[in-house]
């Protein structure tokens, strides 16, 4: 067996290498244990948040879609999560091709700014202090998008595109939220 000297002691080759590594590994292990204990006492790293489920998104989209259809409008309805990612999109076969991206954009904008996109349109008109918001990529400052909230927390947005006006789109979006609002508050 090979013999080495570690800290003045004679050891065999294998255990000598282990002895050196053991000391080197022990220090990071103690630091890791210490950091775990510190994080247990420190601030939380994850935030609990309400999340809109796909079934609720679909129910809201369907209710908005049917409300518009009964009014004689051919529209697209989109529901997004709080990050603006599409959860449900319903498009009438006769709705214009632009309505899909516009509905998603309205829903995402409503969620991002936490406000009715019709109000955002008024607040960002030319000459207003916030008019530059209209130039932000992905922002759709046209009526028809509403934030979706549950127990006071933002969980997503709904957007409707294709009705004769932004106000008509908004009425349909409100019908979609109303269809699921009781269930959102219970969960």
Task: Please provide the spans of the model-predicted regions.
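N-terminal secretory signal peptides that target proteins for export/translocation
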Residues: 1-19
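Intrinsically disordered, low-complexity peptide-like regions
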Residues: 5-8, 34, 167
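Bacterial N-terminal signal peptides
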Residues: 13-16, 21-34
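Flexible, solvent-exposed loop/hinge segments and secondary-structure transition points
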Residues: 39-187
């Amino acid at each position: 067996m090979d013999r080495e000297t570690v800290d003045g002691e004679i050891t065999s080759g294998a255990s000598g290498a282990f002895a050196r590594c053991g000391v080197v590994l022990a220090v990071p292990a103690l630091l890791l244990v210490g950091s775990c204990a510190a994080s247990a006492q420190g601030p939380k790293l994850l935030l609990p948040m309400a999340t809109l489920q796909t079934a609720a998104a679909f129910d809201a989209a369907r209710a908005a879609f049917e409300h518009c259809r009964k009014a004689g409008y051919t529209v697209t309805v989109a529901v997004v999560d709080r990050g603006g990612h599409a959860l449900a999109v319903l498009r009438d076969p006769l709705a214009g091709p632009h309505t899909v991206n516009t509905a998603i954009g309205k829903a995402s904008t409503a969620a991002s700014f936490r406000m009715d996109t019709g109000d955002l349109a008024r607040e960002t008109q030319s000459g207003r202090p916030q008019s530059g918001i209209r130039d932000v990529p992905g922002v759709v400052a046209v009526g028809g998008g509403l934030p979706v909230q549950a127990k006071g927390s933002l969980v997503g947005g709904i957007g409707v595109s294709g009705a004769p006006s932004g106000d008509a789109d908004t009425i349909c979006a409100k019908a979609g939220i109303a269809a699921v609002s009781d269930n959102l508050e219970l969960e």
